[in-house]
Amino acid sequence: MKIGILGAGNIGATAARLFVAAGHDVAVSNSRGPDSLRELISELGPQAHAMTIRDAARFGDAVLLAVPWRTPEALPEPELLRNKIVMDAMNPYRPDGGFYDLGGSTSSEEVLKRLPGSRLVKAFNTIYYV
C-alpha cells in the first residue's frame, strides 16, 4: 500500500519507519518542504520519498495526518483526500499543554468538516510516539 504522511515529527517519522518495515511505500511531508527530510528518507531507504504536503496527499492510498492542531493550513485541499482512508493522529493540544476549545465538537468532527468526503479513522491519538 502507498501511504502519504503529512507531518514528520515524532508520530509521523515513527509511523513512516513502521510502515516501511511492514513493506509499504511512504511519502513523507512537512511544512518545511522535501529538502528538510533528506536524513529521514535516507534512513528509511528506497520505499520512502520526500514530497510536498499536496504531493504526499495525492500519493497515498491512505494518508496519515500527523501535523500539530494549530497548523490547519498544513492540511491539503479536501478534494485531494476525497474517498481516501485518512488516519487522523491529530489532537487539539495548545502549545502551552492545554486544549483548544472545540465548542463541544470532537477533534475528528472538526477534521471531517475540513476534509469532507474522506474516510476518516481516528488513530494513534493516545500515544506520543513509539
Q: What label would you give each PLM region?
A:
Residues 8, 30-31, 53, 67-68, ...:
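Fold-independent oxyanion-binding glycine-rich loops
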Residues 16-18, 40-41, 75-79, 98-100:
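Short amphipathic alpha-helical segments
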Residues 45-47, 51-96:
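Rossmann-like NAD(P)-binding element
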Residues 89-130:
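Rossmann-fold NAD(P)-binding glycine/threonine-rich loop
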